[in-house]
Amino acid sequence: MPAEQQEQLPEENIFMYCDKVNEGAFTKLTNDYNFRYLYRTELEIWKSLPFDSDYTEANKLYMADYYNRAYKIRENEFYAKCVVVCNKDNEIIGSCFLWKLDEKINTLHWLKIKKEYEGKGIGRALISKVLENIEEIDLPVFLHTQPGSYRAIKLYCDFGFKIISNEKIGNRINNIDKCITKLEENMPKKYFKKIRYIKLSGEYLDIIEEKGLNDF
């Protein structure tokens, strides 16, 4: 899923995993912004957020289908979890939340900061907010991203996420070799060197595959 703003790079799969959150990466919002939860009247605004000004009819259909498939049956929970960042005019400029696909599979969903607000530390503060009260029982946390989101990948690594090196996650191919090449080409070397990797085995991969958990 388009979890973050994409640069113009191929949309290959990268999967990441965090079993211990690095609280040293946490930051706070400045006074120019505030957190709250998404209102029910703002669903269409939220759906348009990942696409900035390119919210085409095709994207509208995609988001409607995704929402209906992933969240509709647990709608109350969705609104209770969907954290948004607002500016002083109460305009939504970012969003992110944790979402459990299964009792043991927790995922980070839809990190997005509007393009004009990038580079202001809002994304880091937003992830900090989402993860600040996470407990051991909520770990590990999985996420799905693409190599075009290399700025977000740097953030994820700061918070303790590692890139999963398994060839397949559920029924999706993990394009690890292609993605690492793209990341190395586009990330500053000092950040690329900080990326850590993990090969998973056992129950988590089995659960994802057996239950067809692809909505992350």
What are these regions (language model features)?
Residues 1-31:
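Acyl-donor-binding surface of acyltransferase catalytic domains
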Residues 7, 131, 157-166:
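Conserved acetyl-CoA-binding loop of GNAT-fold acetyltransferases
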Residues 26-62, 86, 182, 186-189, ...:
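Short amphipathic alpha-helix that is part of the acyltransferase structural core
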Residues 51-114:
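A conserved beta-strand-loop-helix scaffold within acyl/acetyltransferase catalytic domains
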Residues 110-112, 130, 145-147, 165-168:
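Active-site proximal loops enriched in glycine and acidic residues that flank catalytic Cys/His/Asp
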Residues 134-145:
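Conserved GNAT acetyl-CoA-binding A-motif
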Residues 143-153, 169-181:
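Conserved beta-strand-loop-alpha-helix junction that forms the acyl-donor binding cleft
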